[in-house]
Structure formats: structure tokens, C-alpha cells
Amino acid sequence: VTRTVRVAPPNSLIFLCDEGGGVVPEFVANKLVLATSSAVSVGCLAEMDGETEITLGPTGDVDTRGLKVFDDVLETPTRRIVVETSEGEILLREDVSSNRVHVGIWVNRYVEPDKIVVGWKTL
């Protein structure tokens, strides 16, 4: 199932991680995407400039025609991945059938994207 939300996330940042939490990557200025083995942060449109459209779903079901900015494995020990704000508000949630998933992230532009697509595939 593919889900989409439109939000203006606090701090213009979203996180993808296991619902049980993850080790958040340390901030690095001017980096759109940062990651650890258990969490990914993605910058988005400045919150005062409007909303960002965020889509989460199986890789085969999402639009992968954007700019690929992430392609790696994410630990999912609770078998549920979430997209959340820097304040911990869950925006999107998806059950997965494995404790590790391959994740691809696509954006519509490298600076302040207002469209972010997250595709996942079980390993």
C-alpha cells in the first residue's frame, strides 16, 4: 500500500526509521540526506515556504522517476517503518515482513525538495 501526506515539517526535516526508534545521524550542514544503519534524515522545503509531499510504499508501487538520493539497507527490528518529524510525530507508517529492508529515496530537486518518495523492499 502506498501512502502520501502533505506537511510542512518542523525544522524542514523528516526521518525514516524503525517504529521502535533508531540512531539519528548527526547534523551536517548542506547535506540533504544523512543516514545511520537505523535512521535516515531527509531535508525538505523550508517549512515557512509551504508543504512537502511525502510518499511511502513498496518500491514497485511508488514513482521512482525523481533524483535518487539514497539507496541502502535500513534496520527494522519491529518490522514497522515510519516517517516522522524531528519532534517525533509519525506522518506515515508501514508494516514490513523483515527486520532489514532495502530503501530508496527519490526527490524532485537537490535543494529544498517539496516532493520526497520513499520506496522499500524486504530483503
Question: Over which residues does each language-model region extend?
Answer:
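Surface-exposed coil/turn segments at beta-strand junctions on protein surfaces, enriched
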Residues: 35, 76, 96-98
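Functionally constrained cores in energy, signaling, and assembly domains
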Residues: 93-95, 119-120
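Primarily secretory-pathway and cell-envelope proteins
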Residues: 1-67, 111-123
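Extended, solvent-exposed segments with strong compositional bias
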Residues: 63-94
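Generic hydrophobic/packing signal
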Residues: 87, 107-111
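A glycine-anchored, Pro-Gly-centered beta-turn/N-cap motif
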Residues: 97-106
